[in-house]
Every structure is written in structure tokens, then in C-alpha cells.
Amino acid sequence: MIKKVGIFQDLKSAFACLFSWQDIDEHYVIKLFGAKICKKHKYNVDLKPLTELGVTQEKRSPHLIVSLTTFPARINLVHKTITTLLQQTLKPDMVILWLAEEQFPNRELPASLTDLQQFGLSIKWCEDIKSYKKLIPTLREFPDDIIVTTDDDTYYDSRLLERLYNSYLERPDCIQARQAFMVKRDFNGEFFMKARSYVYNSSYLPSYKNEPVGCGGVLYPPHSLDLNVLNAKQFMQELPTHDD
């Protein structure tokens, strides 16, 4: 299929590569001469206290596991994110928080965090592989289960897991993501990443050009990733800070 493109479209594409502004899932994203600035909206959230177990006691196969990590600078705040993950309309089988032993040598944690264990939180320890801790240790320990990764500084909607899981049931062969970057070519033919928001709509076609964005929540079906992703030496050498 061939589509004619006039000079106006060429100029429009060129301008878009230099400057653009988007409002994506509670973030302002501004692109200016190749530089990207991303700023979260500020708003008040009414965080309700937990009153019941936040994980299911019913048998589910494969298991649905929520996995995240944090570091010392956020250890006193991460309980807020976890609280929202324990208040889901679809309860997971596990909610795991991975912490690096090197960062917490005495394993001293705030009560605001450890108190969540009575509501279903599991705290596990691993080596320091930075933000990859949210996925890799869980993938190693539970290779046959569904894994949903989240960030540690976001309040999640109570239907996050329900929507991701329902989307997974429709396409169990695909990784599900609320947000993704889509690889495209600019007017010079170079590859670049374009922010795109997902709204749990099955009409969005799967593509290997989509890169999931972790803060929105990402669901990985069992065996959806190549075993090479477990090679910590390789990813820490080539992409030490880009777990997405």
C-alpha cells in the first residue's frame, strides 16, 4: 500500500520531531529539540486503610503474582503503593516486594511496611540488580506463573489487575501493558520512541515494536520472555538502568 505525502506532511513531521506536548496517563510529556521532560500531575489521593486480606485464598492456576521493588530513599513511602495493590477488585495470589540485601544490611524496615505482611505482602531479599529487581527474581522463582510488575511510587486504580488479567485472558500469548513506547522512524529514517497510552482496549494490535512502560503496570504471561533476560551480567552491563 502506498500513500502520497505532500510537503506539508513532511514539514509537520519534522516539527513534531523537534517539539511536541502530550498528556499521558497523569504525566505531562514535553519533547523539545530531542530532549524529553516527563512530569507527573500533582493531586490528592484518599488512601483508604486496609481492612481485609489483599491476596486471594482461592486456588488459581497459573498464579497471578504482583512484583515490585524499592530502595532506601523510598522505603518510608512504598507502603502507600503496596496498599493500593492490596485493595484490588481482583485479588492476586501474591504481592512480593524485593529488597536488595546490600541496601538494607541489617534488614531494618519501617513498621508502616512490615505491618502490611498481615494483609498478604511478602518481603523477599535478593542481590542488587537495581530496578530489574521488580521482575527478574520473581521470574526465576515462579517461571510458570503470571507476573505483573509495578513501580513503587504510583497509586494504582483498584481495577488495575482486573483489567490486565481480563486482557490477558483474551490474548494469553501477549504481554499486556497500560502504557507503551512504540518504535517508529522519524523523517530521517532513524528509529525513535513515541509515547502512547493504552486503555485496556483489545483493538490495539500486538506488535514487537511496542515497549511496555513499567509505571502503568505490565503483565507477563508464563514463558513470554526469552530465558536470556535472566542473564544479569549482560543486562547490567548493557542496560543497567532501563528495566523496561
Where are these regions (language model features)?
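Boundary detector for helix-to-coil junctions that initiate low-complexity/charged tails
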Residues: 1-46
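Short, acidic, metal-binding catalytic loop of nucleotide-sugar glycosyltransferases
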Residues: 81-94, 101, 115
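Active-site nucleotide-sugar/metal-binding loop of Leloir-type enzymes
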Residues: 135-146
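Conserved catalytic core of nucleotide-sugar-dependent glycosyltransferases
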Residues: 157-234
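Acidic donor-binding loop at a coil-to-helix junction in glycosyltransferase catalytic cores
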Residues: 237-244
